[in-house]
C-alpha cells in the first residue's frame, strides 16, 4: 500500500539523518515493557472510540453492542489509514451503522458528531496548551486560528442547511442536480431519499441537543480521555528509551500534528505526520533519538491500525458470507 511505503520511506530518511552510535545504544536499552504499555494506550484509544460510538447510538435510541461498535471502529481505522486525510473511515462507519439498523441520515449524524466532538476538543485544548507551555507559539496559534475558523464556517453551513424544512428541501434539490450530472438514473432513483435522510439527520441533531445535554458532556469527556491516551504514547516511548517524558510539550505537539494531518495529501497522512513530528519534537528531544521515536510512534499508532483493522474487515466479510450461506 502507498501509505505504508511512504511512511516507512520517510521514517527511514529521518532515521538516516539522525542516526548516531548513541541511537543504537538507545535501542538496545529500550524498556520493552513500557513499549507494550504504549501499545495498550493505542488499544484503549480504539476501545474508547467504540464506546463513544455506542453512547451516541444509545442517546439516539439505538442499541448497538460494544462488540459491534468496536468492529465498526476497527474497520474504519483500516480504511482511514489508506485514504487521504483519513477520509475513508467516515463512509465505512455510516455504511456499517446502517447495516445494524440505524437510518442512513442518523448514521451520518453519529459519524459527523464524532468529528465535531474531536474538533471541539482540538480547538479548545490547543490554545490552552500553547499558552501553558509556550511551545511553538507562533506556528501553533496560526494552526489553531485556521482550524477554529474552518470549524466555525463548517458549523454555520450546517446550521444554514438544517435550520428548517425548506432549507433542507433546497439542499436536497442541489444534491439531486449534482448527482444527475453524473448519473441521471441514480438521481431519479434516490431523489426522495436525499430529502428523507437529511430530515432524519436534522431530527437526530435536535434529539441529541434537546434530550441529552448531559450526554454531550459525557461524550466530550470520553473524547478528552480517548485523545489523551493517544497523545500520551510518544511520552511513554520516550521514557521507554530512557529519556524524560516531556509530557506537556509532547501533548501540545500531538495536537498540532493531528490537525496538520487533516490536510488531504497522502493516505493516512503518511509522510506528513512523520515530518511534522520530527520537526516539532526536534525542539525538545535529542536529535539522535528522533528517528527511533518517530518509527515506534508510527508503528504503534498507524501500522497497527492497518494490521488489526484488516483483521476486523476480513472478519466482517467472512461473517457476512457465513450469514448469507445460512439464509440460503
Curated annotation (Swiss-Prot):
UniProt entry keywords in alphabetical sequence: Cell membrane, Membrane, Transmembrane, Transmembrane helix
One Pfam entry name: LPG_synthase_TM
InterPro entries in UniProt: L-PG_synthase/AglD
Phylogenetic placement of the source organism: Archaea, Methanobacteriati, Methanobacteriota, Archaeoglobi, Archaeoglobales
Sequence intervals crossing the membrane: 31-51, 116-136, 139-159, 221-241, 245-265, 277-297
Entry membrane topology: Multi-pass membrane protein
UniProt keyword annotation of DNA-binding present: no
Protein family: Belongs to the UPF0104 family.
UniProt-annotated location(s): Cell membrane
Cellular component GO terms held in the UniProt record: plasma membrane
The protein's name in its UniProt record: UPF0104 membrane protein AF_2231
Amino acid at each position: 500500500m502507498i501509505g505504508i511505503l511512504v511512511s516507512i520511506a520517510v521514517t527511514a530518511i529521518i532515521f538516516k539523518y539522525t542516526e548516531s552510535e548513541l541511537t543504537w545504544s538507545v535501542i538496545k536499552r529500550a524498556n520493552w515493557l513500557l513499549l507494550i504499555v504504549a501499545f495498550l494506550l493505542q488499544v484503549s484509544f480504539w476501545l474508547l472510540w467504540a464506546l463513544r460510538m455506542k453512547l451516541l447510538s444509545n442517546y439516539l435510541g439505538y442499541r448497538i453492542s460494544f462488540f459491534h461498535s468496536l468492529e465498526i471502529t476497527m474497520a474504519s481505522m483500516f480504511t482511514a489509514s489508506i485514504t487521504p486525510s483519513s477520509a475513508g473511515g467516515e463512509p465505512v462507519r455510516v455504511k456499517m451503522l446502517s447495516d445494524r439498523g440505524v437510518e442512513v441520515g442518523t448514521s451520518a449524524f453519529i459519524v459527523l458528531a464524532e468529528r465535531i466532538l474531536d474538533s471541539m476538543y482540538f480547538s479548545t485544548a490547543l490554545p490552552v496548551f500553547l499558552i501553558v507551555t509556550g511551545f511553538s507559539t507562533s506556528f501553533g496559534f496560526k494552526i489553531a486560528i485556521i482550524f477554529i475558523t474552518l470549524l466555525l464556517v463548517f458549523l454555520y453551513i450546517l446550521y444554514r442547511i438544517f435550520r428548517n424544512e425548506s432549507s433542507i428541501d433546497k439542499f436536497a434539490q442541489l444534491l439531486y442536480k449534482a448527482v444527475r450530472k453524473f448519473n441521471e438514473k441514480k438521481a431519479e432513483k434516490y431523489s426522495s431519499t436525499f430529502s428523507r435522510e437529511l430530515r432524519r439527520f436534522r431530527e437526530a441533531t435536535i434529539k441529541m441537543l434537546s434530550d441529552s445535554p448531559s450526554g454531550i458532556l459525557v461524550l466530550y469527556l470520553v473524547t478528552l480521555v480517548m485523545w489523551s491516551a493517544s497523545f500520551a504514547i510518544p511520552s511513554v516511548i520516550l521514557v521507554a528509551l530512557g529519556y524524560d517524558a516531556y509530557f506537556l510539550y509532547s501533548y501540545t505537539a500531538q495536537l498540532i500534528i493531528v490537525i496538520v494531518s487533516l490536510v488531504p495529501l497522502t493516505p493516512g497522512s503518511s509522510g506528513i505526520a512523520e515530518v511534522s513530528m520530527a520537526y516539532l519534537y526536534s525542539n525538545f528531544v535529542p536529535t539522535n533519538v528522533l528517528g527511533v521515536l518517530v518509527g515506534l510512534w508510527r508503528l504503534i499508532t498507524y501500522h497497527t491500525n492497518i494490521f488489526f483493522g484488516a483483521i476486523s474487515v476480513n472478519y466482517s466479510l467472512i461473517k457476512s458470507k457465513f450469514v448469507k450461506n445460512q439464509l440460503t
